[in-house]
């Protein structure tokens, strides 16, 4: 194996302003140590130090570091160098192998990381060699998902505030798709941030507000509905207190508008980038996967096909495969808690959407429920099956085939 021929290993203990570097040989002898700054000069100093100890394009020195992000990692990943992102908890266990005094220092941690590669490189996985487009999709998809979560967080704050003084607004918008994040809800609440102002809205003002929000039909029905709600009797705060709550609502609505705009803009950017990728057609052939959800899945699994040796590895990474804990007479099989949470989040949405889009997926889910699985367990089981099929399709460059994927279940249903 390629790691058998390596004789030099590098460990980096990273920080915000500087990084400690340690280089060891295959016997554990410290060849060099240094502290570099977190800038171009520091990165060049690191590359020069590696070159002094045999680093080249043909024989790059592998590097261990406790992060997979940042400009330092990007500089190290140029070329064919293997960069290993070591979990800090795992690194802490290695620190105790050579002493129990629990002493700790940044140069010492860099040495520990270098020795991890020297002794146990085969047990750790290098960062995947994803394409530039796949890395861009990862950035956009994660940013869009974060924007959606931020939007919901601010919407929850708006909802909590409205419960304090403005129940009519909740009655008017919360039951509709999108709830308080809807454009018409945000426009109307900006026009009338208090119950007193809402009760004074005229039909013309409501019509203008709905038009400004982008609504194009069913004006009269919606206008009458809103006016009826806003002029109904509800419990009220004192006038001065109500006005103060109104100012707070306007501040939150400005934040909500910004998060909604960010989520929409990022969704467009994600979809455009995703459709440029060669794997997009395969992902979109699966039931339940659209451009946005497909991009989230691709963002987490990447396009380095050597990353997962088999479907089981992908399932374990996603957290859909169960884990076994056995010791003596004890034997337990349960769900995984250490997993890629973003991939699992996208996977649950994928499995749920597939119930309506795929008869085979629906039959699989129903069979698991009949066997006693709860909803979440049945969805996780369905996702586990989908991931195995996705791994096969990506490796063989095939599109999803409903008849082949769920043939026994479809035959039984027929």
From Swiss-Prot:
InterPro entries in alphabetical order: Transp_IS110-like_N (IPR002525), Transpos_IS110 (IPR047650), Transposase_20 (IPR003346)
This protein's superkingdom?
A: Bacteria
Q: Does the keyword DNA-binding apply?
A: yes
Q: List the disulfide bonds.
A: none
Q: Which UniProt keywords apply?
A: DNA recombination, DNA-binding, Transposable element, Transposition
Question: Molecular function terms in GO for this entry?
Answer: DNA binding; transposase activity
Q: Name one GO biological process term.
A: DNA transposition
Does the keyword rRNA-binding feature in the UniProt annotation? no
Q: What is this protein called?
A: Mini-circle putative transposase for IS117
């Amino acid at each position: 194996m390629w790691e058998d021929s390596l004789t030099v290993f590098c460990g980096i203990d990273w920080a915000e302003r500087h990084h400690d570097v340690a280089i060891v040989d295959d016997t554990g002898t410290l060849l060099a140590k240094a502290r570099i700054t977190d800038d171009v000069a520091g990165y060049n100093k690191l590359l020069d130090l590696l070159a002094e100890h045999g680093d080249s394009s043909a024989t790059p020195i592998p590097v261990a570091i406790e992060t997979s992000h940042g400009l330092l990692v990007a500089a190290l990943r140029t070329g064919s160098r293997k960069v290993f992102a070591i979990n800090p908890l795992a690194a802490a266990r290695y620190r105790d192998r050579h002493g129990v005094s629990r002493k700790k220092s940044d140069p010492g941690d860099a040495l520990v990381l270098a020795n991890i590669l020297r002794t146990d490189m085969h047990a750790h996985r290098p960062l995947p060699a994803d394409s530039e487009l796949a890395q861009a999709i990862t950035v956009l998809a994660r940013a869009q998902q974060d924007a959606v979560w931020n939007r919901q967080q601010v919407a929850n704050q708006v909802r909590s505030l409205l419960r304090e003084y403005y129940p009519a607004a909740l009655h008017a918008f919360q039951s509709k798709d999108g709830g308080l994040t809807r454009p018409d809800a945000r426009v109307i609440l900006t026009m009338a941030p208090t119950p007193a102002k809402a009760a004074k809205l005229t039909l013309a003002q409501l019509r203008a507000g709905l038009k400004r929000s982008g609504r194009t039909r069913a004006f009269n029905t919606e206008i009458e509905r809103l006016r009826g709600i806003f002029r109904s009797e509800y419990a009220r705060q004192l006038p001065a207190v109500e006005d103060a709550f109104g100012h707070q609502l306007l501040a939150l609505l400005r934040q909500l508008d910004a998060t909604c705009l960010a989520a929409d803009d990022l969704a467009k950017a994600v979809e455009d980038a995703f459709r440029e990728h060669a794997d997009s057609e395969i992902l979109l052939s699966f039931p339940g996967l659209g451009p946005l959800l497909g991009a989230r899945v691709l963002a987490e699994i990447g396009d380095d096909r050597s990353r997962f040796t088999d479907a089981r590895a992908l399932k374990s990474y996603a957290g859909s495969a169960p884990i076994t804990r056995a010791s003596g007479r004890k034997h337990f099989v349960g769900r995984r808690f250490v997993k890629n949470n973003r991939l699992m989040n996208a996977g649950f949405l994928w499995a749920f959407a597939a119930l309506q889009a795929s008869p085979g997926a629906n039959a699989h889910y129903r069979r698991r429920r009949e066997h006693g699985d709860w909803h979440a367990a049945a969805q996780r089981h369905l996702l586990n099956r989908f991931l195995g099929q996705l791994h096969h399709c990506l490796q063989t460059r095939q599109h999803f085939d409903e008849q082949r994927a769920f043939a026994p279940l479809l035959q039984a249903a027929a």
